[in-house]
Every structure is written in C-alpha cells, then in structure tokens.
A protein has these predicted regions:
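Cytosolic regulatory regions of ion transport systems
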Residues: 1-135
Length: 135
C-alpha cells in the first residue's frame, strides 16, 4: 500500500508516525522543504519527500498521486485542502482523507466521497481502519 501525504501540519506528522510501519511507501509533498527537516523519525527507506506546489497536477503526479492508495491532505487552509483534494480525485480507487478546521462543510465533501477528519479532534482510527481493511 502506498500513501501520499500533502502538507506539513502537526496532524499530518502524527498520522505519518502512526502509518510508518503499516504502509509500504510514504510520499510527502509540501511547498516548503524546510518543514520536513524536523521529521527525523520519518527518515526511512520507504519515505520520500517532495518539494513543490501541491495545486499543480504535474507536481502531484511527480509526487506519486497515480500510484497512491491513500491520500491525506492538510494544507493549513480548508479552501486549499479542498481544492487539492478535488485535483487528486482523478483515481477513483484511492481514498482521500481531508483534515479540516471548519467542519460545517464536511457533509458536502463526504457526499463527494472524501473522508473528513476534524483537525481539533483527530480520529486516527478512521485512517487505521481503512488501512486494515486492505491489508
């Protein structure tokens, strides 16, 4: 199983540390490479970091979008996260998790097939259950 993680929030770091042993390959994409420098626990053979603009489809493809089974997005801004999620929705066989601060719009995007996580009450069990379902 492969996962693409877009952004560099603390929530993504927590999720990544949980997934590191459960996922074959982890790909990270963020526009600011220096943010990954404090993620030393994730410096492993199955982890690759990409630097680039997540809103551009070419960058997403280069970072492993097409081969990813699981995509987790937290751009730090809900509108940006939702925009990137819609760009990532080219492969209908993957699951896209979006971390949002404003849960008032979550129903709309869940109806579109996205899995929404609340940034203030991160339900990591949703991610773990998804992974276990496919192992």
């Amino acid at each position: 199983m492969k996962s693409l993680i877009i952004g560099s929030s603390n929530n993504l770091k927590k999720i990544s540390e949980l997934l590191i042993e459960k996922i074959d390959d982890l790909f990270f994409l963020n526009s600011e490479q220096f943010k990954f420098s404090s993620w030393a626990a994730l410096n492993r053979d199955n982890v690759t970091f990409y630097n680039g603009e997540a809103k551009e489809i070419d960058t997403l493809l280069k970072a492993g979008l097409e081969g990813s089974d699981l995509i987790i997005i937290d751009m730090g801004d809900d509108a940006e996260s939702l925009f990137v999620a819609q760009k990532c929705n080219i492969n209908l066989s993957n699951a896209i998790f979006i971390i949002l601060e404003d849960m008032s719009i979550s129903d709309i995007f869940e109806d579109l097939g996205f899995i929404i996580l609340d940034s203030s009450n991160l339900a990591l069990d949703k991610v773990v259950k998804y992974i276990e379902k496919f192992k």
